[in-house]
């Protein structure tokens, strides 16, 4: 016979390992901040590649907040609030390495934070 305490302990263990999940619209600011965090980290890691892309595509502009976040190694998330969702999407998907590098990293970061997205 299984004791109630064993069942309770098992349920508690499962609950402790299960992460809370949240479903948000792709344009939600929390989603944008995760995306921008990955983007800033990717720029830092591949700065020369982004410089080359900028030279080849001078009309692709970035908000000043992105540059400030890239070169400020403290907590930059508050700098990135207020960037319009369509601008976030344009910047992130506008680079050739979006599908191979950014998209998987963004998906991983959202999943790690328990965030799942739905189309707007």
From Swiss-Prot:
Gene Ontology molecular-function annotations: structural constituent of cell wall
Protein keywords: Cell wall, Cell wall biogenesis/degradation, Glycoprotein, Secreted, Signal
Inducing or repressing factors: Induced during anaerobic growth and completely repressed during aerobic growth.
Subcellular location: Secreted, Cell wall
Function according to Swiss-Prot or TrEMBL: Component of the cell wall.
Cellular component GO terms, alphabetical: extracellular region; fungal-type cell wall
Family matches, as InterPro entries: SRP1_TIP1 (IPR000992), Yeast_SRP1/TIP1_CWP (IPR050788)
UniProt-recorded name of the protein: Seripauperin-24
GO-annotated biological processes: fungal-type cell wall organization
Gene: PAU24
Family indicated by similarity: Belongs to the SRP1/TIP1 family. Seripauperin subfamily.
Leader sequence residues: 1-20
């Amino acid at each position: 016979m299984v004791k109630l305490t064993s069942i309770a302990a098992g349920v508690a263990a499962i609950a402790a390992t299960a992460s809370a999940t949240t479903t948000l619209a792709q344009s939600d600011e929390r989603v944008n901040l995760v995306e921008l965090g990955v983007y800033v980290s990717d720029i830092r890691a591949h700065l020369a590649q982004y410089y080359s892309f900028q030279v080849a595509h001078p009309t692709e502009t970035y908000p000043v907040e992105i540059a400030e976040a890239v070169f400020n190694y403290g907590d930059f998330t508050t700098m990135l609030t207020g960037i319009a969702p369509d601008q976030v999407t344009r910047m992130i998907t506008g680079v050739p390495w979006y599908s191979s590098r950014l998209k998987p990293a963004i998906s991983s970061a959202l999943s790690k934070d328990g965030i799942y997205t739905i189309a707007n």
